[in-house]
Design a protein with these regions (language model features):
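Metal-dependent de-N-acetylase/amidase catalytic core
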Residues: 21-24, 28, 32-188
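A conserved beta-strand->alpha-helix junction
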Residues: 2-20
């Protein structure tokens, strides 16, 4: 594949929608699952793959997506308990990754995006294809930054991979205002 990954792994839950979406009513919607059950499934992958670093969403799920918040919560538990033989005892040999990182959007990127949106007559409190993302509320929350990765050298590869992900905007994510700002910051 485009990214050269050794594997892609799924937890076999159904995608939820943003708050208020009918998709959230599905019994297999990720955000509706017991957090410890999801954490046990994540522990299975941690123990099997033995990563040095575990990466998950920030505590607000990037843009307040219920699934992103749910997987954040489960991943934090899994990271903390992957070396506990009592937690998920059938999930393989215990293992402790060295570090846990959260992906978070650059607040400077969000602030510039909001200014540009207003300049072009767009409402930053109604972002996204469903107009259900409030960039102002996201920019108001900040998290400590412990590591930054400049992706300019791999931005074209990241964009190509993003074009394959139709449910996340596909080609639309590299067009228009977001694409312009993303290329300027090197953060698509």
């Amino acid at each position: 594949g485009i990214l050269g990954l050794a594997g892609v792994y799924f937890l076999d839950y159904r995608d939820s929608g943003m708050p208020g979406s009918a998709d959230n009513e599905h019994p297999r919607a990720l955000f509706a699952q017991p957090v410890n059950e999801v954490a046990e499934n994540v522990v299975c992958y941690i123990r099997d793959l033995k990563p040095d670093i575990v990466l998950t969403f920030d505590p607000i799920g990037g843009y307040r997506h219920p699934d992103h918040i749910a997987i954040h919560d489960a991943t934090v538990i899994a990271f903390d308990r992957a070396d506990d033989p009592i937690f998920a005892p059938n999930a393989g040999e215990t293992y402790k990754p060295r570090k846990l990182y959260y992906h978070t959007f650059s607040r400077a990127f969000l602030r510039v995006s909001m200014r540009l949106m207003r300049l072009f007559g767009q409402d930053p409190t109604q972002f996204g294809s469903n107009k259900d993302i409030d960039l102002e509320s996201l920019a108001a929350v900040s998290f400590p930054i412990h590591a930054k990765i400049n992706i300019r050298s791999v931005l074209k590869k990241k964009e190509a991979a993003g074009r394959c992900h139709a449910s996340q905007g596909g080609m639309q994510m590299q067009k228009g205002l977001r694409g312009l700002v993303s290329r300027f910051f090197g953060k698509a």
